[in-house]
């Protein structure tokens, strides 16, 4: 479940830290969250797709590590990102 170029560009524009930013932790978390959402929808209808489930768990772990990094570096940016993406209640 990959993202097309237009979706990626939109995510980059909404979460970038500076104008030429394409790979900051915030952008990576936003892209992972979108991919996780798409893959979760896929797994709702394909419950026996175990390889996709494994990939989903890897993406969730990576997002968790990136969020932990952001939280350690700047708690304010972490709180804004979580609110903007809509994760963690």
Swiss-Prot record:
UniProt cross-references to Pfam families, sorted A to Z: Ribosomal_S15 (PF00312)
Position of the signal peptide: none
GO molecular function, one term: rRNA binding
A biological process term (GO) from this entry: translation
Keyword vocabulary terms for this entry: Ribonucleoprotein, Ribosomal protein, RNA-binding, rRNA-binding
Record field: transmembrane: none
Gene Ontology cellular component annotations, sorted alphabetically: cytosolic small ribosomal subunit
Coiled-coil spans in chain: none
SUPFAM superfamilies named among the record's database cross-references: S15/NS1 RNA-binding domain (SSF47060)
InterPro entries associated with the record: Ribosomal_uS15, Ribosomal_uS15_bac-type, uS15_NS1_RNA-bd_sf
PANTHER family, A to Z: RIBOSOMAL PROTEIN S15, BACTERIAL AND ORGANELLAR (PTHR23321), SMALL RIBOSOMAL SUBUNIT PROTEIN US15M (PTHR23321:SF26)
Record family assignment: Belongs to the universal ribosomal protein uS15 family.
Function summary: One of the primary rRNA binding proteins, it binds directly to 16S rRNA where it helps nucleate assembly of the platform of the 30S subunit by binding and bridging several RNA helices of the 16S rRNA.
Subunit structure: Part of the 30S ribosomal subunit. Forms a bridge to the 50S subunit in the 70S ribosome, contacting the 23S rRNA.
HAMAP family reported in the protein's UniProt record: Ribosomal_uS15_B (MF_01343_B)
Protein's UniProt name: Small ribosomal subunit protein uS15
Source organism: Prochlorococcus marinus (strain MIT 9215)
Organism placement in taxonomy: Bacteria, Bacillati, Cyanobacteriota, Cyanophyceae, Synechococcales
